[in-house]
Amino acid sequence: MMAGLSNAVSSLFLKEFVGAFLLSMRYFFRPKATLNYPFEKGPVSPRFRGEHALRRYPNGEERCIACKLCEAICPAQAITIEAGPRRNDGTRRTVRYDIDMVKCIYCGFCQEACPVDAIVEGPNFEFSTETREELYYDKEKLLANGDRWEREIARNIAMDSPYR
């Protein structure tokens, strides 16, 4: 009898409805937990591995010395390098540096293997394309990425350097 009366009182005063409404109102005035993605972007870790880039020295010369360590260590065999002839000062530079982004698994081994920090995976993660051919990066595209993202790349490398 008491259980039936208790249920009737709860139903009469809409106890569950009021409780749910109060809970909704409490969360309504809290800061939002989600971001409106295309317009708002969350923080990206300095160790984030995004679109590849080739870096230059401050004087404008490319950093890559054509040692081919990144090509050798790439587990997906996505990197192809052709070294040019030795220059008068004994150094080499690349004639061809291609990355097949379709094959790339973004493991970061190329960045870790590079002795001069020439190839890096930058902070850019928004590089969708309409055709598959646009995902074959040549040396010019990689150098352009490096020029575009150099400030962020240098900051990320500096922030991560104590842990290397």
From Swiss-Prot:
Compartments where found: Cell inner membrane
Domain 4Fe-4S ferredoxin-type: 54-84, 95-124
GO cellular component: plasma membrane
UniProt-listed SUPFAM superfamilies: 4Fe-4S ferredoxins
Membrane topology per record: Peripheral membrane protein
Highest taxon above the source species: Bacteria
InterPro entries the UniProt entry points to: 4Fe4S_Fe-S-bd, 4Fe4S_Fe_S_CS, NADH_quinone_OxRdtase_chainI
This enzyme's EC code(s): 7.1.1.-
Pfam families: Fer4_7
GO biological process terms held by the UniProt record: aerobic respiration
Cofactor: binding details: Binds 2 [4Fe-4S] clusters per subunit.
Cofactor(s) needed by this chain: [4Fe-4S] cluster
Coiled coil region boundaries: none
Catalytic reaction(s) noted: a quinone + NADH + 5 H(+)(in) = a quinol + NAD(+) + 4 H(+)(out)
Residues annotated to bind [4Fe-4S] cluster 1: C64, C67, C70, C114
Assembly and binders: NDH-1 is composed of 14 different subunits. Subunits NuoA, H, J, K, L, M, N constitute the membrane sector of the complex.
Stated family: Belongs to the complex I 23 kDa subunit family.
Annotated function: NDH-1 shuttles electrons from NADH, via FMN and iron-sulfur (Fe-S) centers, to quinones in the respiratory chain. The immediate electron acceptor for the enzyme in this species is believed to be ubiquinone. Couples the redox reaction to proton translocation (for every two electrons transferred, four hydrogen ions are translocated across the cytoplasmic membrane), and thus conserves the redox energy in a proton gradient.
Record-given protein name: NADH-quinone oxidoreductase subunit I 1
Source organism of the structure: Rhizobium meliloti (strain 1021)
Gene coding for it: nuoI1
